[in-house]
Swiss-Prot record:
Residues 172-235, 287-305, 376-399, 542-552 are extracellular. The lineage of its organism: Eukaryota, Metazoa, Chordata, Craniata, Vertebrata. Inhibited by mazindol, cocaine, desipramine, GBR 12783 dihydrochloride, GBR 12909 dihydrochloride and nomifensine. Inhibited by zinc ions. Brain. Expressed in the substantia nigra and ventral tegmental area, regions that contain dopaminergic cell bodies. This is Sodium-dependent dopamine transporter. It is a multi-pass membrane protein.
Length: 619
């Protein structure tokens, strides 16, 4: 169906909102009617087939300022993993050589997918489920990413609660993780201990004899009071109180929509950069810092011959940008229709990558200092995950002058890094469901309260004595293969079923420029192939989770797979439901299922472009 010419039968009328001429004012609606013998015809090539009714379009709130949107996207994408995962992967996989596959995958897959989600949400002006009016049969992928974001909230908020606990603990003359004379310490605690094991440094029994490790595992988590995931014990009141504060902060950041969250990110998205700069300036002055930075940047191009390096780069690109959680779709749905989403995608992905790379200097300057302090190689103190930011880094900070102040600043940075990412995940769930169910839309504040309370109640399992085992299980299964699967189906749905040509036309209507051949090739071929590769690799290389020396029982692994498959199952379940609920023959059902809702009148006339070879070959 041509966008410049839409014929309708006698006694029909067409109402189409014209392209916005003023981004600030309400959308003007223009009707250009040409009387013909056969009825009424719309003849303006700039008119838009609206993604929703004009009333819905007018009621859609928008960001107060463009910078609110950019800070929200940056705050969501730049999270704790930028600090604790990328620098370690870079060091482990050949230093500077790791940047080759990382930047390659970022350019051919990461940026195109990021751009695709921003454009998808902005054009359709709905959340992760509602945008699938472009291909109704795949609406289940919207519920997949919403459910994944909901699952992630169960354990991600706990990391923020840990950081808040450490933040409060920093307001003491002597930091509680520098001595072995506390009530939680074991007889094996030794101030002078240095680990010679890099396997899970800080999270195993060997390194667990340092004061910093014992404070995290015994003083905060009370892990010594649990025998495993089948012996959780009661929630710890200190962590529960911190979790309550996190939930309260999240609720009042989200209850009024982007009008409130857009103001919160002015602090949460910018403060980490101030603190990282201060830590870098302090870190490079420490003895051994240059050794750590040299280890971080050392180039070993022979490592590029190893498949594991490319796998690590591919998975890091997928997870670091935050595609597939529905957050980018939700955020961009509140943009003005004519916003330049292409420029936004380039800016935010570039900032994300630069932040990951620069944080490595901060991390490894302190790791070099710790290696010299303990007289061990860098590899014996280099680690990723919670062990880095809750054991290694606090121990290093504790040796500095004004250690309490540095500790408070560091954990305040972790709080802000976590809060805006958690806000993004919650907004994905709220926007996705509120846009789908009008009853929830009328009671958004109450629904937001219900969502944050639900995540709080389920997060309580993670703040028990054995809560770290629940945390590890959720971290391993909730957003692993399932999120990659969701992004793969999303990419196929947009580029193949909806069509790259149609998608490019949509972007041209918004920005005035059609994406060039490079982006269309990436959407059509490169990104789906890349995602298929990553999904297959994640399944083939799957290893059951473990925490230090603790091996999870079979029933726990089975529960983990139930969590993972429950979100992925939304795709076939909804597709089956949609197909069976449509009227007509098998061919008519299929036509309605894969044709955008706005083009269903064409299906009535037997014009189904998805049934033509040309549709599948066009770029």
């Amino acid at each position: 169906m041509s966008k410049s010419k839409c014929s309708v039968g006698p006694m029909s009328s067409v109402v189409a909102p014209a392209k916005e001429s003023n981004a600030v004012g309400p959308r003007e609606v223009e009707l250009i009617l040409v009387k013909e013998q056969n009825g009424v015809q719309l003849t303006n090539s700039t008119l838009i087939n609206p993604p929703q009714t004009p009333v819905e379009a007018q009621e859609r709130e928008t960001w107060s300022k463009k910078i609110d949107f950019l800070l929200s996207v940056i705050g969501f994408a730049v999270d704790l993993a930028n600090v604790w995962r990328f620098p370690y992967l870079c060091y482990k996989n050949g230093g500077g050589a790791f940047l080759v596959p990382y930047l390659l995958f970022m350019v051919i897959a990461g940026m195109p997918l990021f751009y695709m989600e921003l454009a998808l949400g902005q054009f359709n002006r709905e959340g992760a489920a509602g945008v699938w009016k472009i291909c109704p049969v795949l609406k289940g992928v919207g519920f997949t990413v919403i459910l994944i974001s909901f699952y992630v909230g169960f354990f991600y908020n706990v990391i923020i609660a840990w950081a808040l606990h450490y933040f409060f603990s920093s307001f003491t003359m002597d930091l509680p993780w520098i001595h072995c004379n506390n009530t939680w310490n074991s007889p094996n605690c030794s101030d002078a201990h240095a680990s010679n094991s890099s396997d899970g440094l800080g999270l195993n029994d060997t390194f667990g004899t340092t004061p910093a490790a014992e404070y995290f595992e015994r003083g905060v988590l009370h892990l010594h009071q649990s025998r495993g995931i089948d012996d959780l014990g009661p929630p710890r009141w200190q962590l529960t109180a911190c979790l309550v504060l996190v939930i309260v902060l999240l609720y009042f950041s989200l209850w009024k929509g982007v009008k409130t969250s857009g103001k919160v990110v002015w602090i949460t998205a910018t403060m980490p950069y101030v603190v990282l700069t201060a830590l870098l300036l302090r870190g490079v002055t420490l003895p051994g810092a240059m050794d750590g930075i040299r280890a971080y940047l050392s180039v070993d191009f022979y490592r590029l011959c190893e498949a594991s390096v490319w796998i690590d780069a591919a998975t890091q690109v997928c997870f670091s940008l935050g595609v597939g959680f529905g957050v980018l779709i939700a955020f961009s749905s509140y943009n003005k229709f004519t916003n330049n989403c292409y420029r936004d995608a380039i800016i935010t992905t570039s900032i994300n990558s630069l932040t990951s790379f620069s944080s490595g200097f901060v991390v490894f300057s302190f790791l070099g200092y710790m290696a010299q302090k303990h007289n061990v190689p860098i590899r014996d103190v280099a680690t990723d995950g919670p062990g880095l930011i809750f054991i290694i880094y606090p121990e290093a900070i504790a040796t500095l002058p004004l250690s309490s102040a540095w500790a408070a600043v560091f954990f305040l940075m972790l709080l802000t890094l976590g809060i805006d990412s958690a806000m993004g995940g919650m907004e994905s769930v709220i926007t996705g469901l509120v846009d789908e169910f009008q009853l929830l839309h009328r009671h958004r504040e109450l629904f937001t309260l219900g969502i944050v309370l639900a995540t709080f109640l389920l997060s309580l399992f993670c703040v028990t004595n054995g809560g770290i085992y629940v945390f590890t299980l959720l971290d391993h299964f909730a957003a692993g293969t399932s999120i990659l699967f969701g992004v793969l189906i999303e990419a196929i749905g947009v580029a193949w079923f909806y069509g790259v040509q149609q998608f490019s036309d949509d972007i041209k209507q918004m920005t005035g420029q059609r994406p060039n051949l490079y982006w269309r090739l990436c959407w059509k071929l490169v990104s789906p192939c890349f995602l298929l590769y990553v999904v297959v690799v994640s399944i083939v290389t799957f290893r059951p989770p473990h925490y230090g020396a603790y091996i999870f029982p079979d029933w726990a692994n089975a529960l983990g797979w139930i969590i993972a498959t429950s979100s992925m199952a939304m795709v076939p379940i909804y597709a089956t439901y949609k197909f069976c609920s449509l009227p007509g023959s098998f061919r008519e059902k299929l036509a309605y299922a894969i044709t955008p809702e706005k083009d269903h009148q064409l299906v009535d006339r037997g014009e189904v472009r998805q049934f033509t070879l040309r549709h599948w070959l066009l770029l």
